[in-house]
Swiss-Prot record:
Keywords: DNA-binding, Nucleus, Repressor, Transcription, Transcription regulation. Residues 129-148 have a biased composition (Low complexity). GO terms for cellular component: nucleus. This is Transcription factor HES-3. Transcriptional repressor of genes that require a bHLH protein for their transcription. One of its GO terms (molecular function) is DNA-binding transcription repressor activity, RNA polymerase II-specific. Residues 126-166 are annotated as: Disordered. Has a particular type of basic domain (presence of a helix-interrupting proline) that binds to the N-box (CACNAG), rather than the canonical E-box (CANNTG). It comes from Mus musculus. The gene is Hes3.
């Protein structure tokens, strides 16, 4: 057991020596390095590497999170905003979302009009007399069709809003 451990140590020291010879070739000059010399040169190299990298990657703090989030949101917004000559596959992001928080409770005015790219849950809206709008088939998974009267409209939560995007339909949005 002890022989295997010593063999592993010697193999690792030999690898370190060959790496250090490449880096410190002007200082070593073909002399035989002892184990202590190899370890000292390794420590010296690691310290110089640590000092050279210290200013490159500062430790992130929680203060930078909001500005980083808003910067990322601006970049995503620019990528998703339709431009000239686009095929129309992109959709616009809210300018209000770029300004504020990710929670609607922070700024209730920022949720005036939403145009998300995600699919919506469609449900029939009620007309003035309490009757349903005209029936239209809804596509279901597996290619099944079902009448829209069988779909129950979800009840919006207190901070959710329903948008009217097509006549006779309400769209439930979780924000």
């Amino acid at each position: 057991m002890e022989k295997k451990r010593r063999a592993r140590i010697n193999v690792s020291l030999e690898q370190l020596r060959s790496l250090l010879e490449r880096h410190y070739s002007h200082q070593i000059r073909k002399r035989k390095l002892e184990k202590a010399d190899i370890l000292e040169l390794s420590v010296k190299y690691m310290r110089s590497l640590q000092n050279s990298l210290q200013g490159l990657w500062p430790v992130p703090s929680g203060v930078d999170y909001p500005s980083g989030f808003q910067g990322g949101l601006r970049g995503v917004s620019q990528r998703l905003r339709p431009g000239e000559g686009d095929s129309g596959l992109r959709c616009p992001l809210l300018l209000q979302r770029r300004e504020g928080s990710t929670t609607d409770s922070a700024n209730p005015q920022a949720t005036s009009v939403l145009n998300p790219c995600l699919p919506a849950i469609w449900a029939p809206s009620r007309a003035a007399g309490g009757s349903h709008s005209p029936q239209s088939p809804l596509p279901l998974p597996g290619g099944l069709l079902e009448s829209s009267t069988d779909v129950v409209a979800p009840h919006p939560a207190s901070n959710c809003q329903a948008e009217s995007t097509r006549p006779g339909f309400r769209v439930w949005r979780p924000w």
